[in-house]
Amino acid sequence: MGNIKQTFIKRTARELFDRYPDKFTRDFEHNKKMVAELTNVTSKTIRNRIAGYITRLVRMKEEGKIL
């Protein structure tokens, strides 16, 4: 069993994904750079968790699991 993501990570990721849907891809490294550009997150750990969740959202959208 994995860990559950914290609420502020999910909220921030969803807001970024809704606001800039064309800027994110399935590539984690690209998403990591975009999160760094679009937010003022200073912590690498938080930035990576947000980018990872956005990568998951992109994959789920492509597979038709979310609208």
UniProtKB/Swiss-Prot annotation:
GO-annotated biological processes = translation
Kindly give the Gene3D superfamilies that the UniProt entry links to this protein: Ribosomal protein S17e-like
- Transmembrane spans: none
The record's keywords, sorted A to Z, are: Ribonucleoprotein, Ribosomal protein
The UniProt entry, under Pfam families, shows: Ribosomal_S17e
Judging by the UniProt lineage, the source's domain of life is Archaea
MF (Gene Ontology): structural constituent of ribosome
Gene Ontology annotations for the cellular component aspect, listed alphabetically: cytosol; ribonucleoprotein complex; ribosome
Q: Which family does the record assign? A: Belongs to the eukaryotic ribosomal protein eS17 family.
Q: How does it assemble?
A: Part of the 30S ribosomal subunit.
Protein's recorded name: Small ribosomal subunit protein eS17
User: Which organism encodes this protein?
Assistant: Thermococcus kodakarensis (strain ATCC BAA-918 / JCM 12380 / KOD1)
